[in-house]
Amino acid sequence: MAWIQIRLNSTNEKAEQMSDFLEEIGSVSVTFMDSQDTPIFEPLPGETRLWGNTDVIALFDAETDMAEIVRLLKEAKHLDSNTAYKIEQIEDKDWEREWMDNFHPMQFGKRLWICPSWRDVPDENAVNVMLDPGLAFGTGTHPTTALCLEWLDGLDLKDKSVIDFGCGSGILAIAALKLGAKSAVGIDIDPQAILASRNNAEQNGVADRLQLFLSDEKPSDLKADVVVANILAGPLKELYPIISQLVKPNGDLGLSGILETQAQSVCDAYTQTFALEPVAAREEWCRITGKLKTL
């Protein structure tokens, strides 16, 4: 089936109203894209943070009369002489196959591979985590996930307990278990993340060693030898009292989801309690690691 796409330049104030209207007049999907390569940092809970200049992209059936769509947009004052727009035909493709073709096995550190289930495992003797993009973020493609996976690969996790704080897909907890950890706990605020982590753990044969909790249901006395939190700088600082209490004496802490420009403020929050190591950076993101200080 072929499609017609209209791309309209808008602002963050008008983009969502334009999106609603496009759906009302027959668009089968609407997406937002950045017009000027402007980064977006941490949104508040429940907030849809958009760029100052936002492109609204709507997809219509190929039989749609786009002249009528443009007329309706003008009539509703979503389109005027100052609004740039472009209409183009979209080639019909096997989108599912193209999406799958974009994911390949990825290596992290010396031993660890993350592999989509539809790909052959590159090294049968490696530590292979089978993980498909799906219910929650975290497949190894983002620099922060990669930094955390490489850190875990470099640790001696044999017989260790691990907490994945903000577990998402469960990728870090599952990788830790397959790297030798005795047990792991995944914590998240999102029930979808708990579901995704459970499904991924079952796929990798480690579900019996992974406990999962919503953040407000975790045991009050929970502690582990290794704690990793790949969330965002703001929450990492705000949750310092909680995260630091999860680490056993002489235990290891790994933090990511942090921009390089935010690293110092996160280090400042944790430095009294942890002996921090040099910050590791990749593509403007970084990882902070350290050991809990002993009195």
Curated annotation (Swiss-Prot):
The keyword Glycoprotein does not apply. Gene3D superfamilies: Vaccinia Virus protein VP39. One of its GO terms (cellular component) is cytosol. S-adenosyl-L-methionine binds at T145, G166, D188, N230. Signal peptide: none annotated. InterPro entries: Ribosomal_L11_MeTrfase_PrmA (IPR050078), Ribosomal_PrmA_MeTrfase (IPR004498), SAM-dependent_MTases_sf (IPR029063). Its main location: cytoplasm. It is found in: Cytoplasm. SUPFAM superfamilies: S-adenosyl-L-methionine-dependent methyltransferases. One of its GO terms (molecular function) is protein-lysine N-methyltransferase activity. Keywords: Cytoplasm, Methyltransferase, S-adenosyl-L-methionine, Transferase. The keyword Ion transport does not apply. GO terms for biological process: methylation. Methylates ribosomal protein L11. This is Ribosomal protein L11 methyltransferase.
